[in-house]
Design a protein with these regions (language model features):
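Extracellular loop and loop/strand-boundary signature of outer-membrane beta-barrel proteins
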Residues: 60-63, 107-111, 177-182, 219-225, ...
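Residues on the lipid-exposed face of transmembrane beta-strands in outer-membrane beta-barrel proteins
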Residues: 9-14, 75-79, 123-127, 194-198, ...
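Outer-membrane pore/translocation modules
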Residues: 37-84, 90-125, 134-136, 140-189
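Detector for outer-membrane/organellar transmembrane beta-barrel domains
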Residues: 116, 128-264, 269-278
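Short, small-residue-biased leader/transition segments that mark boundaries at the very start
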Residues: 1-11
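Outer-membrane beta-barrel pore domains and translocons
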Residues: 33-35, 80, 96-100, 139-141, ...
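Predominantly the C-terminal beta-signal and adjacent terminal strand-loop region
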Residues: 276-333
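Repeated loop/turn-to-beta-strand initiation elements of outer-membrane beta-barrel proteins
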Residues: 19-28, 83-95, 131-136, 144, ...
Length: 333
């Protein structure tokens, strides 16, 4: 039996103290190990606010291609308006850069601001508070960075923003002799997301509403035929706070995780996959929370679902869905 230990996050948040910043705040974040989702002016969803987090996709506001939890060497800055009362809506802008291989001192293998950094640049502009909010975000993903969640077809490593591609090289063309050599693909991704939420003033049988929509495009060279070059996702989350008793919540989220919308060569994919999540959270004691949940995915393989039939016909009748459940227990001390 092996036991491994490590630090998940190491970073420092430093507010800028200046008498001129009376109505505004400016915070700098820097560290050798941090996530880009920890350096945002606001979280653009109320679905998981103070509640359970069951599936990663719903926990990331339904747009994991932008809020992809990229972890590595990071620096960021958050600008935010100050409000008279806590929870009042405020405008904020945040920017951060995360190099997932920033801890490697060799620029051939990693480092900061190199071709091999696996860098993520995320910028968010938002306006919101406790009751409502809206945010627009953009993430530039260097080659080697992923979109985190989606169909199996969309998340295939050979299709997902790889840094290298195999190119055939003739050594003796007259003899038809040659071999594949590795060549930089110069790929990167451009990811956009728009989110909004509304929370009722009183808890009970009126739910909060959270929505999200995202689009992505992968650019570069050397794409395999039929590989995805564009994708999108959308999400709707409803959450009832204190619906059974104080501290007990009910949530339902549904939508379509990241799925391909365009293939290299101008082909149209059949990559759609619907997801539904339902959970009920019970505050058993002051320190213990129990959350039973169920979830369903209609076509998690996406475009690969056709591989289940012998002819691999995208117009065929191949089906494959998943229904699952989870009981989450949280202990706080």
């Amino acid at each position: 039996t092996s036991v491994s230990r490590g630090l998940g996050d190491v970073y420092k948040r430093q507010p800028l103290k200046n008498d001129e910043l009376i109505d505004h705040s400016l915070i700098f974040i820097v560290g050798p190990m941090a996530r880009n989702t920890e350096s945002l002016g606001m979280w653009p969803s109320a679905y998981n606010r103070g509640g359970a987090r069951i599936l990663d996709w719903t926990g990331l506001a339904g747009v994991p291609n932008v809020y992809n939890k990229a972890t590595g060497a990071m620096f960021g800055v958050i600008y935010k308006e100050k409000t008279e009362n806590k929870g009042d809506p405020a405008f904020s802008v945040s920017m951060n850069y995360v190099a997932e291989d920033g801890g490697d001192g060799d620029p051939v293998l990693g480092g900061m601001f190199t071709n091999n950094s696996r860098g993520n640049f995320l910028v968010q502009a938002g306006w919101g508070g406790e009751e409502y909010g809206v945010a627009f975000a953009y993430r530039y993903g260097q080659c080697g960075t992923g979109q985190r969640r989606g169909t199996n077809f969309m998340m295939d490593d050979s299709f997902n923003n790889e840094c290298w591609r195999d190119v055939w090289n003739w050594t003796e063309k007259d003899l038809y002799q040659g071999d594949y050599i590795a060549e930089r693909s110069e790929r990167n991704s451009h990811n956009f997301a728009l989110n909004g939420y509304w929370v009722p003033q009183e808890t009970g049988w009126i739910p909060s509403v959270s929505v999200g929509y995202a689009r992505s495009a992968i650019t570069g060279s050397g794409f395999f035929k039929y590989s995805p070059v564009a994708s999108q996702s959308w999400f709707v989350g409803l959450k009832w706070d204190d619906v059974f008793d104080v501290g007990n919540d009910l949530g339902v989220g549904f939508g379509m995780p990241n799925f391909a919308t365009e293939l290299a060569g101008g082909y149209t994919p059949n990559d759609a996959n619907y997801l539904v999540e339902l959970y009920a959270s019970f505050q058993v004691t002051d320190n213990i929370q129990i959350t039973p949940s169920v979830f369903w995915m209609s076509r998690p393989l996406g475009h690969y679902t056709a591989n289940l039939s012998g002819d691999q016909d995208q117009n065929g009748a191949s089906t494959f869905g998943i229904f699952g459940g989870l009981i989450q227990s949280v202990f706080r001390f």
